[in-house]
Amino acid sequence: MNKVAWVFHTPPHGSTAGREGLDAILATSAYSEEQALFFVGEGVLQLVNHQHPESILSRDYISAFKLLDLYDIEARYVCQQSLVSWGLSEQDLLIEVEVVDAQALAQLLHHYDQLLTF
């Protein structure tokens, strides 16, 4: 069985990478038992609550991250240093995550067979 890690490292509205990544996760959730999401660097901005992408004529896919619970995708990690660099805390995020430091995040990534970045 493939263990897949999805790494979000781009901001939410500068490209379609975040939306495409989320779509891919939801589409493949039935085929892979062990999946985890990692949010690093600008990727932590994917999860910031109370975004209004329609004001910049962007599609609001951010709220679809709430679907992860319905798909039983519970392994969700956010880089602590990335949160701090953006002046954010766990309370600013849309979904429940585990906040880990960069070293722990790197160790977690080693458990996965495939890494897909968005």
Swiss-Prot record:
InterPro entries cross-referenced by the UniProt entry: DsrEFH-like, Sulphur_relay_DsrE/F-like, Sulphur_relay_TusC/DsrF
One Pfam family recorded for the sequence: DsrE
Coiled coil location: none
Gene3D superfamilies: DsrEFH-like
Localization per Swiss-Prot or TrEMBL: Cytoplasm
Disulfide bonds: none
Entry's transmembrane regions: none
GO cellular component: cytoplasm
Keywords: Cytoplasm
Main location: cytoplasm
UniProt keyword annotation of Cytoplasm present: yes
Protein role: Could be part of a sulfur-relay system.
Membership in a protein family: Belongs to the DsrF/TusC family.
Protein's name according to its UniProt entry: Protein TusC homolog
Organism: Vibrio cholerae serotype O1 (strain ATCC 39315 / El Tor Inaba N16961)
